[in-house]
């Protein structure tokens, strides 16, 4: 009987393990942190709820309103009028645990362990031996163990050890930084079904910042390319300031950071080793979405293993596994390319960002955006809509090029009046805890002992992502 090791217990690894175990294949699922709380916007599209049979209990909020805020703080509201449609907001620790446990219930061996080394054999064609530290006993040091397997699915995130073992090649990464800020009930009511996206060089020179609602707190974060990593805390302070009028009574309960892949790796299958999720580089440009594509890639890879192994009775070849890559690229390659083009156009400077937010005020653009995200499908348009969208896009490009030198500066938001904010600050209202910023950049914010700070860099941390469709 075929034996498969799935390294990494996030959405991609768990969904792969579920398919394999359900087919009766001996499946070992490795995850170092079973309480994984990866920094991630936590947005999932509506189609994922049905496609992956997710219960409503894991969805904290059903977002039907998205507010886009431009560099000058112009606000554009995008609404989902159909009450059956929504963007699901979840906590990664809840979603990941559900998917892992479902795979285990179907027969996958769930190992609380960290894979430290992989022997790949001659020319990486096997046999494959995993060296790992087993933490099942609860001891801090763990117990060293080995396991020989026929195939390996690498679902261990951007810092993938499996990718290194198979010489998959490097890729550029972005850095996602996020604070979880707990708000009193009267403030959380504002975010009942609302998420916010902010654009501007003050919050990210090449991405966007977000305020996404969770169960009893909001995730407030930003992302930028690795070359700008030294700026990340200043950018986080930028989104704090832009969104401050709704966060003044908040308290930071966790600070998180994580790398995000910017494009697929050069090699995603070598021998009988295959990469999925963040390890493979399946995060979309422009939106940073990763959860759905992680889960989908894990499932597609596992389905190919089941099919090519005749249900586990034979060992698939490298050529067999590469069929999964061909199917993936055919299905989603155009989506990744289009979103990369859009990022290059609309995130190039603040003038282009301003034009982009204005575009989002158009109802046809809103419907196109939401349908594409919610259902992961290409939305057809009539000739008039196509012409209008083309003109709007060209206008944004021209405006971005013409106005870029002038430079935009944020203006006060209209969420609360200046008088209201002054009154709140007079009685000591302020965000408590969180990041520390250099004295030369922005005012520092002390980190209280009660705040939990998590900088995630481990090899078995899974998919990421700030996500909307907008990880």
Language model: regions and residue ranges:
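Glycine-rich FAD pyrophosphate-binding loop
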Residues: 5-7, 21-40
């Amino acid at each position: 009987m075929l034996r498969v090791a799935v390294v990494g217990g996030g959405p991609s690894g768990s969904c792969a393990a579920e398919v394999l175990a359900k087919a009766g294949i001996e499946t070992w699922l490795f995850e170092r942190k079973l309480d994984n709380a990866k920094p991630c916007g936590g947005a999932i599209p509506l189609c994922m709820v049905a496609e992956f049979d997710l219960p409503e209990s894991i969805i904290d909020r059903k977002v039907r309103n998205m507010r886009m805020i431009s560099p000058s703080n112009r606000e554009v509201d995008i609404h989902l009028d159909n009450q059956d449609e929504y963007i699901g907001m979840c906590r990664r620790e809840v979603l990941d645990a559900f998917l892992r446990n479902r795979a285990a219930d179907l027969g996958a061996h769930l190992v609380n362990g960290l894979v430290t080394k992989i022997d790949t054999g001659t020319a990486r064609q096997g046999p494959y031996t995993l060296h790992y530290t087993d933490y099942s006993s609860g001891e801090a040091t763990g117990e060293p163990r080995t396991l020989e397997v026929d195939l390996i699915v690498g679902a261990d995130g951007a810092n993938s050890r499996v990718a290194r073992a198979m010489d998959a090649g490097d890729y550029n990464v972005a850095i996602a930084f996020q604070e979880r800020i707990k708000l009193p009930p009267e403030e959380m009511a504002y975010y009942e079904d609302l998420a916010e996206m902010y654009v501007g060089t003050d919050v990210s020179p090449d991405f966007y910042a977000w305020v996404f609602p969770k169960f009893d707190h909001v995730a407030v974060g930003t992302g930028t390319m690795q070359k700008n990593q030294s700026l990340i805390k200043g950018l986080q302070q930028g989104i704090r300031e832009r969104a401050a009028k709704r966060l003044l009574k908040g308290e930071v309960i966790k600070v998180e950071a994580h790398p995000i892949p910017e494009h697929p790796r050069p090699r995603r299958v070598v021998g009988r080793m295959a990469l999925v999720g963040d390890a493979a580089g399946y995060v979309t440009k422009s939106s940073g979405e990763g959860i759905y594509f992680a889960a989908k890639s894990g499932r597609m890879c596992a389905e190919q293993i089941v099919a090519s192994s005749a249900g586990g009775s034979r060992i698939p070849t490298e050529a067999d596994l590469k069929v999964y890559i061909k199917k993936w690229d055919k299905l989603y390659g155009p989506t990744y390319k289009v979103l990369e083009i859009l990022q290059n156009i609309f995130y190039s400077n603040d003038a282009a960002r301003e034009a982009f937010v204005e575009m989002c005020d158009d109802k046809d653009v809103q419907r196109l955006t939401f349908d594409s995200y919610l259902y992961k499908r290409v939305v057809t348009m009539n000739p008039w809509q196509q012409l209008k969208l083309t003109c709007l896009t060209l206008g944004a490009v021209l405006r971005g090029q013409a106005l870029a030198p002038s430079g935009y500066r944020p203006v006060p938001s209209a969420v609360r009046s200046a008088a209201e904010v002054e009154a709140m600050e007079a009685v000591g209202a302020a965000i408590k805890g969180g990041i520390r910023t250099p004295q030369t950049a922005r005012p520092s914010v002390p980190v209280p002992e009660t705040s939990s700070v998590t900088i995630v860099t481990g090899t078995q941390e899974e998919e990421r992502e700030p996500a909307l469709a907008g990880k």
